[in-house]
UniProtKB/Swiss-Prot annotation:
Cross-referenced Pfam families: CysG_dimeriser, NAD_binding_7, Sirohm_synth_M, TP_methylase
Protein's recorded name: Siroheme synthase
Gene3D superfamilies named in the record: Cobalt-precorrin-4 Transmethylase, Domain 1 (3.40.1010.10), Methyltransferase, Cobalt-precorrin-4 Transmethylase, Domain 2 (3.30.950.10), NAD(P)-binding Rossmann-like Domain (3.40.50.720), Sirohaem synthase, dimerisation domain (1.10.8.210), Siroheme synthase, domain 2 (3.30.160.110)
UniProt lineage: Bacteria, Pseudomonadati, Pseudomonadota, Betaproteobacteria, Burkholderiales
EC assignment: 2.1.1.107, 1.3.1.76, 4.99.1.4
Gene from which this protein is expressed: cysG
Length: 473
């Protein structure tokens, strides 16, 4: 370790910034946030610094650098674009035993400013010892994605209750377990939900019940359509905090690979032909049992849990059984598959509305408004429609949708094996059969679907019926 990490209390202490440009602006703003009394010296100041000086936010020294500027300074930052000036600042600071940072010049610096993840009062600092600043920045971005912004509130709450926690849990082992519960349990969840009052109530109740059993919770997470890059930061955090993950059949391996390594993974996806209601009842029972055992449960569903995912039913069940829960939205298939196929779901010239429809219904239970669906100037996105293409096509044509209306079938949308098959509504069932389209696939119907022929940027694209050579193959 070539650098000793240290956090400096600069409140009310004089810090000199030499330089008046954009870099000096950034350094000055960071120092002011830390409570420093900042003095900026330069021949000219950036408008932002000039405004701060006029408002009394900083002190100003005009002209070129002079060693006398260092009088009374605890730290100095050299932020000019002239290395000779920066070297002079560094030498003068060294002679006076004042720590000096020369921006982007480790050789001239006696201290370095790290990349920072700020969840005050919790602060994470990352340094590459000046060797690879880009690497430090990348690491900071990764850490930023892992820690919710409510973490600072949680740290402040823990600090405020520290004496009471110590009194209520005098045994060190008990106290550690309590802090684990505090960081991972319902208090942290309430803060993430912007409910600080309820968070404090949870903490008060726990302190009044010294030996209370750990209380589990369920996070309903939308996994998106398959590309792990489309997972939200909150979803990633939930996967990294999970004790057990109950995942659906369409959740991709790439998404599961991002989960905590020691989390238990249980597939609960429904298979074609089985009793889906019975399977759903088993999922409900499993969520309840795991949460009551004090575990952090992630219910991981493809796409978004509230778009044809029975997420509402699962939340109703959890609420009825007094299980704490959260919901993390996911990118639903209609949005992601269309985007990866180059299809804008709305377009000023072609579609002023979008309708998301489930095609997973039997003819004797069909309550869809087919007359409304058959109107033009709208985009239809049919979920779970591969097995119902003949029925969907017949109903739309019967209610007046034009036979020449474009369609796009997006198979395995957003995944490496994505394939887009396009054509016209009249030929939809035949094209799908001849092209051997298989689930999972999203069906898009409307004028915008034709844009896939020119705008698709990802995966394979096949238009219309296969030619004789393809059929022979």
């Amino acid at each position: 370790m070539t650098l000793f990490p240290i956090f400096a209390d600069l409140t009310g202490r004089r810090v000199l910034v030499v330089g008046g440009g954009a870099v000096a602006v950034r350094k000055t703003q960071a120092l002011l946030q830390a409570g420093a009394e900042v003095v900026v010296g330069a021949p000219r100041l950036d408008p932002a610094l000039a405004a701060l000086a006029e408002q009394g936010g900083i002190a100003r020294l005009d002209g070129g650098f002079e060693p006398a500027w260092l009088a009374g300074a605890w730290l100095v930052v050299a932020a000019t674009d002239d290395r000779a000036v920066n070297a002079a600042v560094s030498e003068a600071a060294r002679a006076r035993r004042v720590f000096c940072n020369v921006v982007d010049d480790a050789e001239l610096s006696s201290f370095q400013v790290p990349s920072v993840v700020d969840r005050s009062p919790l602060i994470v600092a990352i340094s590459s010892s000046g060797v690879a600043p880009v690497l430090a920045r990348r690491l900071r971005e990764r850490i930023e994605s892992l820690f919710d912004h409510s973490l600072g509130q949680l740290a402040a709450l823990a600090a405020r209750y520290r004496p009471r926690i110590r009194a209520a849990r005098p045994d060190l082992g008990q106290r550690r377990r309590f802090y684990d519960w505090l960081l991972d349990g319902p208090v942290a969840a309430r803060l993430r939900q912007q409910q600080p009052g309820l968070a404090e109530q949870e903490l008060e109740q726990a302190l009044r019940a010294p030996q209370a059993a750990p209380r589990g919770s369920v996070v309903l997470v939308g996994a998106g359509p398959g590309d792990p890059g489309l997972l939200t930061l909150k979803a990633l955090r939930a996967l990294n905090e999970a004790d057990i993950i109950l995942y659906d059949r369409l959740v991709s391996e790439g998404v599961l690979a991002l989960a905590r390594r020691d989390a238990e993974r249980v597939p609960v996806g429904k298979l074609p032909g089985e009793d889906h209601d019975a399977t759903q009842a088993r999922i409900h029972a499993l969520m309840l049992a795991q949460a009551r055992a004090g575990r952090r449960v992630v219910r991981l569903k493809g796409g978004d849990a509230f778009i044809f995912g029975r997420g509402g039913e699962e939340l109703e069940y959890l609420r009825a059984h007094d299980v704490p829960y959260e919901v993390v939205p996911g990118i639903t298939a209609a949005l992601a598959c269309a985007a990866y196929a180059g299809i804008p779901l709305t377009h000023r010239d072609h579609a002023q509305s979008v309708r998301m429809v489930t095609a997973h219904c039997r003819a004797d239970q069909d309550t869809l408004d087919w007359a409304g669906l058959a109107r033009d100037q709208q985009t239809l996105a049919f979920y779970m429609g591969v097995g119902q293409l003949d029925y969907v096509t017949a109903r739309l044509l019967e209610h007046g949708r034009a036979p020449a209306t474009p369609f796009a079938l997006i198979e395995n949308g957003s995944r490496p094996e994505q394939r887009v098959v396009t054509g016209t509504l009249a030929e939809l069932p035949e094209i799908a059969r001849r092209r051997s389209v298989r689930p999972p696939a999203l069906l898009v119907i409307g004028e915008v679907a034709a844009l896939a022929d020119t705008l698709q940027w990802f995966g394979q694209h096949q238009h219309g019926l296969p030619g004789p050579q393809a059929l022979a193959a």
